[in-house]
Amino acid sequence: MRNWTKFLAGLVAGGFVLSATAALADEIRVGITMRMVSENGQKYGQMVMDEIGLINEAGGINGHQIKATLMNDECKSDKGVANANKLIFQEKVHLLIGSTCSSVSLPIVDVTAKAQVPQIIPHSTNAQITQKGSAWVFRVPVSGRFYAGVNAKYVGENIGKKIAYICAADAASQNDCDAMQAQMKSQHGTDPAYVAQVQEKEVDFRTHMQKIKSAGVDGIMVAALAETMARALVQSYEAGIGPDVRRIGSSSASNAPVPKIAGDAVKGVFYAAAYSDADTRPVARLFNEMVRKRYGIHAPDHDFSQAYDLIRIVEIALNNAKVSLTSSSLKADRAAIRDAIAGIRNYQGLASGPISFCSDPSPVCRD
């Protein structure tokens, strides 16, 4: 097991982590901004850095080393934008990876579009990210627009149509709540039985849970980041809402902090996610074992798998990009990397299906 003390301290401080390689004149510079305020979040960032380090150890990209710079945006939009500006204009990165939270990725899309820097998303699911029409953004994770359709079909057919909603204020959760309600209306003709808008880091759900209990619902959807979701699940049982009322989670229910914090309250929660550690494919078994050995995570979630797939896609694109890597070629090199990512076709990794991109700046090409 690694000694994480110095690494974690640097991330909490919000500063730079050591680069994956020393500065070189013909290096490929990659900037990364992610939410690293939890143990899992810190390990997502470390895995990305470790994988880039392994690429460098194997000879790099067409003989060029990758200089990776990792920053912690704490899921705060202002910090994410500041990180992006620093990485783009001071570090002069060729490619930006980020962020974890949709509320951070959304404003960064405007920054990268204006600066003409390719941006690839590791975790954010808010559908608006690729609806902005930016020619510079790509998304590896499944868009929230797809989750909503799947969730609503299952819920309406197997749980019931009288659903209450707890919606946290972060952009991904807001999108998940809105999309789920729209899909329940479209597929089953039903309106929400109850909707509660809560803070991103809400700690007290008791009043809402009492009202939901009185409403006699079939299910409760909790759309929130992992820690907030876990608290809501626990308090739903404390309010006396029995297991016959199904709990429905947004995709963050797959994140390790949820069962760790919620304990028995997580039992029976329905959610859709892009990856499961129960996947029996050889590639998934190898990945699960790697994450367990390196990072001590027994059940890797889809944020681990999506970050890993992202690095593999970036590796392919960088190898295919025709770059000069001189002081005067930065603009052209950024465009070449953007075009190489757009050229990715049928990447087969940890996701349940192939990942492809294309040049049109639309959700069809960029999700």
Regions found by a protein language model. Give the residues of each.
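NAD-dependent ADP-ribosyltransferases
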Residues: 1
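Extracytosolic ligand-binding ectodomains
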Residues: 4, 8-11, 24-367
